[in-house]
Each structure stands twice: as C-alpha cells, then as structure tokens.
C-alpha cells in the first residue's frame, strides 16, 4: 500500500529556488529572441593550433654498461609559436584564412647511449575580419601574399628512468632507480607561402576536449592520465561596409604543452622476503586533434550556432500547454503571473507545513515535534508519522525557511530521540540492545507509539534522511547560538550527535547492504534512492568529528562504508548504471521484468544529496548526464501516459508521476497519475543545475558524443546538435557569455514550465 509524501516540503523548496535573484546579466528572462548574440569586435587576429605528438619509446641498452637494466624513455615537448603581426587589408564581406604547416622534431641521447626522437606537426591559422551584415552572404576566395618568416622555438627534454640490480652480501637483491633529464633546444624557420583561403563566418568560440593516454607500469597494471585541451579562435567583425584594415599590434603567441604526467608504482618481494615498492614519475605524450570541419559549433556573427554553414543549431522554443503561450521565438517569456503565484503559494505552503507539525491548533492530537504525513484519516488514512517524510520536511524547513522556528526543531529532535528508544515489530529500541535493526521501522503513530500492523519493513533510508536533517539542525544551532537549556534529554550539539545521529550512522554501517523496501513501500530489494542518501549521511557526518576522534574505529568504519557504498553504486554489475540504459535504474532487480527502471525517486535522491556544492565529490551530481537523461526519459515516457499532458509540447515541462508502470491512484490500485512531488522534483533538478553554474561561475559543458549521453541537451535544449562520433568531445559555453546566458535562460524557462503546469492544474481544481 502506498501513501503520498508530505508534498508541501518540496513545493517550498522549489518556490525558493524559482524565486532566486539571479543577476539579470546571467538570466535575461525578458529577452525576446532565441538567438545567441556575439560579443563585440576584437582587434587582434587569432591563432589556432593542431598538435600530434608521438608516444614514448622503451629501449633495451645494447651495451653492458648497466647489467640487467632497462631504460624507459618518453619525450615531453613544449612548443611555442610566435606569429609576427602584419597589416592586412581585406574586403569586409569575407574573412580570409591563411594556414602554414610544418613538422617539428626533437632528438636527444639518453644516458644509456640510445638516440630517441619525437615529432609534432604544427598548423598555424590566422584569420582576418568578417562582416556582420545579414545581407552579405556571398563567398569568395582571397590570396594572402607571403610576409615574414615564422620562427618556431622548440625546447625538448628527454626523460630517462634507469634501474640496475645488484646482490648484497647475504643474498638480498636491491634495485636502484635513476631519473635523468637531457634538455635540447633548436630553431626551425618556416618560409612563408601564398595561400588561397575560403570564406567562413564565425566569431569567438572555445572548444574543449579531454585527451587521455594509457600505459602499462612495471607491475603490469594499466594506468592512464587525462588532460583537457582548449582552443580559442577569434575573428573580429566589422560594423560597416567597404574595406576594413587591421593594424599590426603585438605578436600572437600560442603555447601548447603536450604531456600527461602520471606516477606509477610497482611492488615485489626480494630474495630476503621483504616487500618493496618503487614509484616512478612518467611523462606520457598525448595526441591532441582539433578538426574544425566535423560539426564542432562556433558562435556566428549572426547570433546563432552555426554548423559550418550547413545548418543551424538553435535553442529550442518553450511553448506551454493548455493553449497558453508563455514563450516563443517571437515574444518574451512572461513570468510575471508565475512570480505572483509563487509568492502566494510560498506563504500558503509554509503555513500548511507548520499546521502538520505538533503542537498544532488544527490537529490537537499531534504531539509536539511529530510531523504527520497527511491530515486525512479515512480514504486514505495517512494520519501517521513516517521517518522519511518527517526528515525531508524538517530538512526543507531548515534549508529554506527564513524563520525555521527553533522550538519546533528541538521538539523534532526530542521525538527522534524517543522513537529510537521505543520497541517495535522489528526489534528492541536503543538502550535495550546494541542492535540497531529496529531503526528501520518506517511508520509510527502520532502519539509516538509503535505502529504494529503489517507494513513494508524495513525501510533503510529513514535513518539516513534523519541524520542529514539533524546535522543541518546542529549547524543552525551553532550559527544562531541557541541555548538548549535542560528541557530535553540533550543539552548540547555534542549530545544531539552522540545520542541520535551516531545511532542512525551505526544503522547505516550495519545494514546498508541489506534489502529493504523502497521509498514507495512496494519493492523489497536494493534501491538507488536508499543507497545515495545513506552515502550522503555518512559523508556529511565525517566533518563533525574532532581531531582526536578521526582515528577512532567508528570513524574508520564510516570511511569504509562510504567507500563501499560509492563502489557499489557505480559498479555496472549492480545495475544502477549499465550500458543498456541511458538513465539511472532505481531498482535493478525488477528492471526488464516488472518495470523499465525509470523512477522519479532517482531525481529526488540527486536533489537531496547534491543540495550544495560541497557534495560535488559524491556520484550522480546534478550535472551528471545520467541524472539529466533520467529527467529526459521520464518526460518522454509520461508525456503520453497521462491525458493532462496531451497539449504539452516536446520541450516543455509536464506533469510527472512516480514511474511509468505505476497503477496506484492515491488510495487504491487502478490507474497511476501525476504527483505534485514528482513534478516539482523536475523543477528542482533544473534550478539546482542553474544555481550550481552561476554560484560557482562554471562553464556549461555539453557532451558531443553519439553514445546518447547528451540526450537531455540534444532533445530538450538544442536542435540539430551534431555529434563527434565516439570520442569524448564537448561543447563549452563559457560562463557569462551570450551563449551561456541564453542557454541558462532556456533551462530556467523549462524549469518554470513544470511549475506553470502545476499552477494551471491547481487553479482548474480550485486549489
């Protein structure tokens, strides 16, 4: 049997998110155009580079200078190219491009006497101004005459690691490692040539890819290192007609570093039985390839994403349901009605939340600190308290309420203290036994007595969510300087942690890998939501131990539990993420048989765990493609399931349910329906995505590969997004650029559209 969550807590969270005062420069909500506009003209020509470096070479000395030794040599190369500026006059209707290509090689001799070398082809491209006039679309070719030779300075270091083996008196074999660097420097002069160039039309853009190299260390293990590579191209755009002259200013220098440094270790046992470990720092050459002809997106002078002139990639329009156009390409996003409704609903939501927490004038039978799931006592009867619902409600109050009512929080702590120590159908409470199994009981009466009727037990997410909420209360008490007094069985934040939180953490340590019912109380197994909130609770708790406690056995158990849960979640063998699906699977044991695995609870988990940047080191962050693609697939499936979504457009928020196969209607089994909780979860995900990028000033990174990891971006945000094959390519929208700001605006409007759907439904039903 299923019952609804206390939905107001999440609505409250969303209202605060949607009303965030983002800087208008970053979220231009009133813009009337869906096009990306370019920045102002630049006066400096650009240089662009294509690098390709050889891999390292392993050689065996032919001499017997170092008996039994092997030498591993790798070439690291730093190339600096200087382009001497010239005065160039060209027609404004065409930019012209000049390309000079040379191959640079470096040679050196290592200490073993071997000669090694590495070569790099170097391509230098310069571009002259282009026109911004929309009517000037003609193409032509331009011949650029040779001017001044281009000199390339190459500094090459040959890194050699040698080792030799000897036998000490007594039979012990030892190995000695020596690392030597041999620098070489030389000049290469490139004679200028005449070059015929072809017209393109684009403005500043940054393209970033991640390049990885892999090698095998002396222990036979495969190691790898990755390096991000950014190429920025700049083409000045004129604002007039006729001829445009770019005056020589200063040399344009492009410096490229092309090595990935990794540290390798190998362990072995010598003849004396002693285990030894050696460490080697290795420079691994990598190959960077940038092809401007395969659909990487530039930002054009015309203000839209161009795909080499063959097609245009534009932000999708957002058109709302029920015949109400909230935004289209010819008008502005009208958010005033939504903002007014949010302010009213915010006030109502806060009032309703506190009415459901004892002591309540509306429901006098609720004991102080008890959070009821619903005031409904018949059809259905949810006049109970759930550990999960209570924790999520309190968490929302502490996180988002301007006045969290400290006495209410202390009363909630008091309820938690006593419920932990109350016997129930799962076992004895804390104090009667050291076994924590009874903490998995999810449902309690409003008078704090145990609910003893049959139910889905245990539910292992409750203690974790309670820990997360209480840790936030501890922070609030410390920040506000609240005096706890002697009214409750805890007189300090240390008491709260030791007497309540520590027991919930012990439950997680003991039972995280045990089966339990999911948050919908329907399936007994291992669940993504449960595991991720357990991981978060353990991770957050570790910062609350003082220096003397951090080496204690309990803290080490917590660290080990954190490692174990993290590994379990991301291991493809466990099914939460695998190659078959393009989304997170909530309960793998029933995927492919009873359900698709799609479930709104995965977004609820990500929203709860990653509510602050400090949790970004944990898996499945808000910007994780798996999280965003889960939202995309939920929208894709539920758009056609529920009749209320019939008039919704493809790139617009819809009413969402729990999972596509749901048959619970809120009271009985028949036909599933959308839920306020689920619909708001979608908005929360997008709001947190926006907040993360703006608050931390992060660039937007859009996957460009074709393994479906960019489904959210290609099908909800952009049109005609070209992929780059199987390589890990990315489109980078730099922070606070026009492209970044307008993309953020579209995501913001998509987030708002879920709430607009909710608003329209509530108004139609009189709520």
From Swiss-Prot:
UniProt keyword annotations, A-Z: Carbohydrate metabolism, Glycoprotein, Glycosidase, Hydrolase, Polysaccharide degradation, Signal
List of catalytic residues: 518, 521
Binding locations of substrate: 455
Polar residues: bias regions: 49-66
GO molecular function, one term: glucan 1,4-alpha-glucosidase activity
EC number: 3.2.1.3
Reaction catalysed by this enzyme: Hydrolysis of terminal (1->4)-linked alpha-D-glucose residues successively from non-reducing ends of the chains with release of beta-D-glucose
Keyword Transmembrane attributed: no
Signal peptide interval: 1-21
Listed name of the protein: Glucoamylase S1
Organism: Saccharomyces cerevisiae
Organism classification: Eukaryota, Fungi, Dikarya, Ascomycota, Saccharomycotina
Gene: STA1
């Amino acid at each position: 049997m299923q019952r609804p969550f206390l939905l107001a807590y999440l609505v409250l969270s969303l209202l605060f998110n949607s009303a965030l005062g983002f800087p208008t420069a970053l979220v231009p909500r009133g813009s009337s155009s869906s096009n990306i506009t370019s920045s102002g003209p630049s006066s400096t020509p650009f240089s662009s580079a294509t690098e390709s470096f050889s891999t390292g070479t392993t050689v065996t000395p032919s001499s017997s200078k170092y008996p039994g030794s092997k030498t591993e040599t790798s070439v690291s190369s730093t190339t600096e190219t200087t382009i001497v500026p010239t005065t160039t006059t060209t027609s404004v209707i065409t930019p012209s491009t000049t390309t000079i290509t040379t191959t640079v090689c470096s040679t050196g001799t290592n200490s073993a006497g071997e000669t090694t070398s590495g070569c790099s082809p170097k391509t230098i491209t310069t571009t002259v101004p282009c026109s911004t006039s929309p009517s000037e679309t003609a193409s032509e070719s331009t011949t650029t005459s040779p001017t001044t030779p281009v000199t390339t300075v190459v500094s090459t270091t040959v890194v050699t690691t040698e080792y030799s083996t000897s036998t000490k008196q007594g039979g012990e074999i030892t190995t000695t490692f020596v690392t030597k660097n041999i620098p070489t420097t030389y000049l290469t002069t490139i004679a200028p040539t005449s070059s015929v160039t072809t017209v393109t039309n684009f403005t500043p853009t940054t393209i970033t890819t991640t390049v990885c190299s892999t090698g095998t260390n002396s222990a036979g293990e495969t190691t790898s290192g990755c390096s991000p590579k950014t190429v920025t191209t700049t083409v000045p755009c004129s604002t007039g007609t006729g001829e445009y002259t770019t005056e020589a200013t200063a040399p344009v220098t492009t410096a490229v570093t092309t090595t990935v440094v990794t540290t390798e270790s190998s362990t072995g046992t010598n003849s004396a039985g002693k285990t030894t470990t050696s460490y080697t720092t290795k420079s691994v050459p990598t190959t960077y390839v940038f092809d401007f002809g395969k659909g990487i997106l530039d930002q054009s002078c015309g203000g839209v994403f161009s795909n080499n002139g063959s097609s245009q990639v534009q932000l999708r329009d957002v058109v709302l349901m029920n015949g109400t156009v909230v935004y289209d390409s010819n008008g502005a996003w009208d958010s005033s009605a939504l903002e007014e409704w949010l302010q009213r609903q915010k006030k109502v939501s806060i009032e309703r939340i506190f009415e459901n927490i004892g002591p309540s004038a509306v429901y006098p039978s609720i004991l102080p600190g008890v959070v009821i799931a619903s005031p409904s006592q018949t059809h259905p009867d949810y006049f109970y308290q759930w550990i999960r619902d209570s924790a999520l409600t309190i968490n929302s109050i502490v996180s988002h309420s301007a006045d969290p009512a400290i006495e209410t929080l202390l009363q909630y702590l008091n309820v938690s203290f006593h419920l932990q120590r109350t016997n129930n159908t799962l076992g004895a409470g804390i104090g009667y036994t050291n076994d924590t199994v009874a903490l998995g009981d999810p449902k309690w009466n409003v008078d704090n007595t145990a609910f003893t009727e049959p139910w889905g037990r245990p539910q292992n997410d409750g203690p974790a969510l309670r820990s997360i909420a209480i840790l936030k209360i501890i922070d609030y008490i410390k920040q506000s300087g609240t005096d706890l007094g002697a009214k409750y069985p805890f007189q300090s934040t240390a008491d709260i942690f030791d007497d309540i939180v520590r027991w919930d953490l012990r439950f997680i340590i003991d039972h995280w890998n045990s089966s339990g019912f999911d948050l919908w109380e329907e399936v007994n197994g291992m669940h993504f939501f449960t595991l991720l909130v357990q991981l978060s609770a353990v991770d957050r708790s570790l910062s609350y131990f003082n220096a003397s406690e951090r080496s204690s056995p309990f803290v080490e158990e917590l660290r080990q539990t954190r490692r174990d849960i993290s590994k379990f979640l991301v291991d493809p063998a466990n099914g939460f993420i695998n190659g078959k699906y393009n989304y997170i699977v909530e309960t793998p044991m029933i995927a492919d048989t009873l359900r698709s695995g799609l479930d709104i609870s995965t977004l609820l988990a990500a929203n709860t765990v990653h509510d602050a940047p400090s949790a970004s080191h944990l898996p499945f962050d808000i910007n994780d493609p798996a999280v965003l693609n889960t939202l995309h697939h939920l929208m894709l499936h539920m758009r056609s399931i529920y009749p209320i979504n019939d008039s919704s457009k493809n790139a617009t928020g819809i009413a969402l349910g729990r999972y596509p196969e749901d048959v619970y209607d809120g009271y009985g089994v028949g036909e599933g329906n959308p839920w306020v909780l689920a619909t708001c979860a979608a908005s929360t995900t997008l709001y947190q995505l926006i907040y993360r990028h703006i608050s931390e000033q992060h660039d937007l990174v859009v996957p460009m590969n074709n393994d479906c990891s960019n489904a959210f971006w290609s099908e909800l945000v952009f049109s005609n997004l070209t992929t780059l094959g199987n390589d890990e390519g990315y489109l980078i929208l730099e922070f606070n650029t026009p492209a970044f700001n307008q993309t953020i605006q579209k995501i913001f409007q998509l987030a708002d559209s879920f709430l607009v759907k909710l608003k329209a439904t509530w108004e139609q039903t009189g709520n």
